[in-house]
């Protein structure tokens, strides 16, 4: 089977760019890999493009927007998850701007897709009574207990 241009560039993106040049964490690799797996599933199920036929020309702004909508409508992804998937695709497009300059406009159109705002979780703090209760749980009749109380009290 002949390797498609998409497969060749995606492999290089992961092995040469992300791991070699950028030195990203294994968690980033895992997240980006999952994002592209979802994209391949979307293209197969919704657009009828199998992974072994996928070409760079298929990755357009419209396709990416439809993919992001599919994530939220079908997969019930939150805005934060949608933005995380978009970040993976944007990173790939940033890489592709230098690898495939004849499609520079295509990559820049995808890069112009905006992230959706999402509500950030507020940090809950312990109340004064909660702090007193927590500190009261530390046994102060031992050396380690007094040490622990001193450390936590700071």
PLM features per residue range, with description:
Residues 1-154:
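Conserved catalytic core of the tyrosine transesterase superfamily
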